[in-house]
Amino acid sequence: DLGAVESELDELVQLQATHKSRCDVLQQLVETKEGYGSGAQVVLAKCDEALGSLADKIKVDEPYVKAVEAALGSNLQLVLTEQPEAARDILNGLTEREEGCASIAALDLIASRNGHFAPDCDPIAGQPALSVLSVEDRFMPLAKALLERTFIVNDLAQATEAWRAAAGKFDFVTLAGETLDNRGVYTGGKQNGNGADSLLGRRNEIAELDVQLG
């Protein structure tokens, strides 16, 4: 009847408003770099030489967000610039103005890197972390430098078995965001691999909400 139709319409309108509000909040968090260190926030907001952060430049499908965030850790906040000279100028400015600390990746320098990890075999289990990333070619050398020895596994038991078989040649990260690095160090606990606290998850959720909002 008409009452039921009106009620359903009201629910749809309310749901749309909720989605729009959530999307706006997430977009603001992305733009203001909420969750970044103060130095990185300053650089990304004020420096023309800054091309964005690493988190801005990579896309990861939802099943792998926790794993990639755990593998990259604070490197997600890396500020990207082209030249080493720009990186030095940015850091000098932060020091002079006492505006915090930041880590800067100079893409030109990284592109000339020759020390690529070249194991003689692959681990007995795991998916290369690089295979779940979408990233522009210009940023791929940096992604390789950070993740070329990292493999995604189901759990720490599988990570341990693969680590032993390879005698510590690789880093492993689980879908839940736990890690076992090449030194044999385990790291785990509560992870934020989705939602507003996740630097990668925010963008995924915004994309999903945009689809729902039409």
Please annotate each region the language model reported.
Residues 1-13, 17:
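Repeat-solenoid scaffold signature
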Residues 11, 17-214:
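Hinge-like oligomerization/junction regions that interrupt long coiled-coil arms in large cytoskeletal
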